[in-house]
Amino acid sequence: MQVVERQVFDIVALNVVSSIPDFQAQDQRNRKFQLRMLRQAIERSPEELQLIVGEVLGLPKRKQEELAKLLRRTTLSAIISAAKLVADRLDFLAGLETMLFDAELKKHFKERSQLHRILADNTWVFGEEFALTVDDQSLTEVLRQCLKATGHEIVVNERVKRVDGTIGIVDLMLSRRVPSAREDEHDHLVVELKAPRVKIGMAETSQVKGYAFAVQEDERFRGVPARWTFWLVSNDMDAYARNEVRQANCPEGVLWESQDHRSRILVKTWAQILHDCRTRLKIFQNELNHNADRDASLDYLKQTYARILQGTHSTGDAEQEDVPGQDVDADDLVPSV
């Protein structure tokens, strides 16, 4: 407190104590709370405090009792953090949707340096149960992390290559332990992202098949108890890809599945992924009565990821897309052993 504020506080506090006969008889915790509220009102602009106190005092008696019960089980800070987490996620989804589907913005929304980087910080979009293990690295690093997760201490010297002999760089790999009698079994989700303006077609499906087949054919992966799912993600797909994921005796969206059902490829659109995310958050959104405004959500995304999203308003050239089969990683510049 500044000197003047301290003097004001002392004067007002003295008057409170002398003017309220039963103040000294109150519980010490209540006395501290009241004096703390008084200090906050003097130190800061009173609008925030008035809003908070007004909301609490305006609660129906039943809601006040519910809040009191909650505060006996957790802290107000934890309650606020939980509500903020849901509100932030709803704003994130609305902002991301705008970036992905706005006709002008998506022209300049880059896959590798922007979309990829944002999603690496928000892997909950692909499922709450997963954690990021590989970010924009080679299939060789995927093998290393897969072995590490299951406790295999094996040195990987020879690089993993696709069936055609080329090197592959995966965008994101997420992992989780599968509830199973076999404690070392894991689920791995490999996500291949495409810029929103890129329709999934033959080149893109061939690229992700190359990753899946590399895992399927490399004998070093076979000794690791794991299930593999590959997602190929963009806004839309062309007629070729649509026919590939609409085959008889196979669920729609499945591009390929191994005979042992332990490895498969799914083609996902952002509309499907965003819908699934909102469905998971729907009950919390209803209770929070939170409506994610388009402009406010876009501002939230741009403020949170200001450094990453620089240039999304520019009219410069769009980012050069990766050519399937020609991915390059620093680790792959070293000659094979």
Where are these predicted regions, by residue range?
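Charged, terminal alpha-helix-loop-beta segments
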Residues: M1-V337
